[in-house]
Amino acid sequence: MKMEELVREIERLKEERNAIIMAHNYQLPEIQDIADFLGDSLELARKAVNVDADVIVFVGVDFMAETAKILNPEKTVLLPTRRATCAMANMLKVEHILKAKEQYPDAPVVLYVNTTAETKAYADVTVTSANAVRIVEKLDSDVIIFGPDKNLASYVAKMTGKKVIPVPEYGHCYVHRQFTLEDVERARKLYPNAKLMVHPECEPEVQERADIIVSTGGMIRRAPEHDEWVVFTEREMVYRLQRLYPDIKFHPAKEDAICIGMKAITLNHIYESLRDMKYEVEVPEDIAEKARRAIERMLEMS
């Protein structure tokens, strides 16, 4: 089936199923073009609370679809392929949290939304890269257990002055970890008039040389501050920014900064998922109830 026909069929099925397509900023351009709502993790979580549809087709990785289901237990949530997983989310296990709580029993557990539903059930509050600093600042504790991204944990510690215990100690996003000081130097030489926008999942030494450190939603909000940027995050964010601001120049810091989990979903997967109503996301209610409290607390504190 040609792309134009595939898009028409997806639109037809959306109407027939009363469905909405929610997609993350890292999705393929052709998916961004058909999404009803595009955003970062925080924006998608907020949107999921007020979705006016019977079916949510979540075009992101599995933990995002789980979050949508947790916030919409009565709706059908579809993840178009089971291969859309997040390696970092799977690094954090319940045992890591319990071990940290033994050592720091009074410390609140703050978990990145990039975690499984099972681990979210042990969180006092969840955060995204967009609101992590603000939420940790509001917590009445100088010691925080934070997982799973060690680089975001380091950034939060630096910005808040609090003691942040990373769980696990090796948690990271492989896409953002690959950005190096050499990439910073190359960007400065290639684009001398550009500023560098860097995601807080990047290594601390890369963050230190950034002009701004922001989530993907923050990149969108702050892009108009300058006329040329080098973007240190997943490659497809450049497409999103360029669509929004055609008069501003955006360059990917690395052409091969690709999230395999995000790229696992194609238009054909979306079509087949809607056609057959397959790959429905389910979260056991006992886990969902506990995780929901942590997510809703995040939304209240944001």
Curated annotation (Swiss-Prot):
Protein name (record): Quinolinate synthase
Cofactors (names): [4Fe-4S] cluster
Gene name per UniProt: nadA
Subcellular location: Cytoplasm
GO cellular component, one term: cytoplasm
Catalytic activity, EC: 2.5.1.72
Species, as recorded: Thermococcus onnurineus (strain NA1)
Cofactor note: Binds 1 [4Fe-4S] cluster per subunit.
Enzyme class: transferase
Entry GO MF terms: 4 iron, 4 sulfur cluster binding; metal ion binding; quinolinate synthetase A activity
PANTHER family, per database record: QUINOLINATE SYNTHASE, CHLOROPLASTIC, QUINOLINATE SYNTHETASE A
